Amino acid sequence: MSTEESMSAPAPGALLLCRAEPDSVAAVAPLLGEPMPLVRAGDGWSVLVPEGGPWRDGGEPVDRVVTGWAAALAVGAPWPVLALWWDADRAGYTLASGFRRPVGYVWLANGTPAGEDEAMRTFAARLGLDPVLDAQSLDRLTRTDPDAGREPGAARAGAGARARLRGLLAVLTRAGITLPAGLDPGEGADRLGAAARAVPGVRWTEAAG
């Protein structure tokens, strides 16, 4: 695929961040039904890196797939799961925690917010983020950027939406999240998988059955 093609049609991808150590995540990961790389992602966090079969081969929307995965993991474990996802048109997240209704937010490709402010506040509360400093940073992610889409190619490449996800991760570093090098929002499943396999201590989860 040429550089121009990859810019015009970014590949869908996702990351599943779990607020638990890798051993705890590996114990419930078979619920997802397919093996995937699992690496540490900071203090008390781990990340699963899906290969993307359901949306690459089965044609299912990436957000629907990872929302279901996050909910399945969270119901089977005592810790929350944060799914980050993106495709050519949008990007967003879903936070699942126990049997509570998952909460999520969406940005359009050019970074325009397309979610509800209350969802972001619920997100912050469930993760125990600072109600002042972190809440202010998250609130800025729900504001429309007057320059959204003005940069040539920004809307086409989904750069604005990916920048919003990076902003979200910047806030979450204060909650302990540190993604390994190469696990960047906006990359396709192939590149994410290659980056995960290069992380020291990577392990593969098992598939159910």
Where are these regions (language model features)?
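Short, extreme N-terminal segment that most often corresponds to the first beta-strand
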Residues: 2-31, 39-40
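Structured loops at beta-to-helix junctions and adjacent beta-edge loops in soluble globular domains
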Residues: 19, 50-51
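Compact beta-rich and alpha/beta scaffold cores in large eukaryotic transport/transcription complexes
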Residues: 32-33, 51-52
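Short, intrinsically disordered, mixed-charge
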Residues: 33-34, 75
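Secondary-structure boundary/capping signal
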Residues: 36-37, 81
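Ser/Thr- and Asn-enriched, surface-exposed coil loops between beta-strands
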Residues: 42-44
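Charged, compositionally biased boundary regions
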Residues: 53-209
